[in-house]
Amino acid sequence: MEYQTLWQRYLDWLYYHQNLGFYVDISRIRFDDAFIDSIKPKFEKAFKDMEELEKGAIANPDEGRMVGHYWLRAPELAPNDEVRKEITEPLKQIEEFVAKVLKGTIKPPTADKFTDIISVGIGGSALGPQFVSEALAGDFPPMGIHFIDNTDPAGIDRVVTRLKDRLKSTLVIVTSKSGGTPETRNGMLEMRHAYEKNGLDFPKYAVAVTMPGSKMDQVAHDWLARFPMQDWVGGRTSELSAVGLLPAALQGIDIQGMLAGAKEMDEATRVKDLKNNPSALLALSWYYAGNGKGEKDMVVLPYKDSLALLSRYLQQLVMESLGKEKDLDGNTVYQGIAVYGNKGSTDQHAYVQQLREGVPNFFVTFIEVLEDRQGSSIELEPGVTSGDYLAGFIQGTRQALYENHRDSITITIPEVNPRTVGALVALYERAVSFYGSLVNVNAYHQPGVEAGKKAAASILELQQNVMKALKEAGTELDLETLSQKAGHPDKVEAVYKIVRHLAANNRGVMLKGDLGKPTTLKVSFG
């Protein structure tokens, strides 16, 4: 495409939000006018779907739930007074609690103030807060934050060990919608043990974010505080609920600024005009790039260190929402878009080589931040700063990819602050909603995650049966015999992996034989 034609295409498809200073450029996605004409009816339906969703329609039919994360920054749009109170009252509770903690009115029993936070949660309860903390927390926040987002014992130990004697001034936030998520439950129990081991009364250091009446809500009845999660907010869209706002506010982040930015972006993404709706432009680009079937991966490249966790946050938001086997009509469709990325220009020295010359199975989203830093920059050579290099690398990489027929989107923001981060969250939340409508999938449930939980529970049940069989046998058993005695002769491989793990962790299980040849192993207990 000639320079003048490409420049005109850029002008034709550039979106700019004046108040937010946001640019969305999809000119390097190679759709044509015929494609736009063909997809307009789908967007008419998508706009209607979003309108009905925001009015309180059951947008998650598999679970019979409303989908209301857009109301979190515009309570006046909630369908009734009860829902409005579910938004405004927790926000007030958060602000009052945070003020008391930061002033030292609410404090730990053996210290003047809380100095740190341990956030226990997984999935959306971790990825959103981690992204926001990395993007917005100051160099010296009023409270430092540490995350336990897995059931990895060594990872948990690392967090506790690094805190040293600051554990006595550390507030624990346990976030679980149902209270039944195993990883979060395990993290909570590990924290309780760590506090008690150090002579600390855990309930006086803990708060919960959960649904009223949940298992976690009952466990936390004597904790410092409980903050409600709404039934109509999913984990991956919960950053602007108590899930994300509480830890952000405790770090001194302006949560009202985040909500304001999200609200402004929501208003922009309600516009029923494809060219003037930034989230619709993203969904359009995703659909074209992947042929409406997720045939190409989404590579997210923010050229700003503080946005390095954006790709991990979007990975869940996009993949858990859109990665579905069935569509809303019950047809098998295998939908989804794979998301990965880190940051520029670091990635130019990692996998961009493949992006430029390897398998063309992707499209890139560049995130550009206009402000280099607060304050002036030195000149590394006449008239050139380190920020100029970064800006040059964005343009250069974009051009190099396009020349080799690799498409890209560029999102440009003025700076990284609470307002722009809130707007980014809202931009992508709506884009996912639109794309879900375009491909006719339920973007608000996660049956595959639930299937994984059930499978893991069955392995733990098998482990109990294996231990019982070993203790009752009182002698060495080969793997096949052990599997039979455990009641599962068809699960020899699973039994082998269970006993191998138990033996490695001094759980009383002993293995004799050639470890490289499982059929030679004899297993015993004692």
UniProtKB/Swiss-Prot annotation:
GO annotation, biological process: gluconeogenesis; glucose 6-phosphate metabolic process; glycolytic process
Catalytic activity: alpha-D-glucose 6-phosphate = beta-D-fructose 6-phosphate
Keywords: Cytoplasm, Gluconeogenesis, Glycolysis, Isomerase
Keyword set includes Cytoplasm: yes
Metabolic or biological pathway, per its Swiss-Prot or TrEMBL entry: Carbohydrate biosynthesis; gluconeogenesis; Carbohydrate degradation; glycolysis; D-glyceraldehyde 3-phosphate and glycerone phosphate from D-glucose: step 2/4
GO-annotated molecular function: carbohydrate derivative binding; glucose-6-phosphate isomerase activity; monosaccharide binding
Function: Catalyzes the reversible isomerization of glucose-6-phosphate to fructose-6-phosphate.
NCBIfam families, per the entry: PRK14096.1
Protein name, UniProt field: Glucose-6-phosphate isomerase
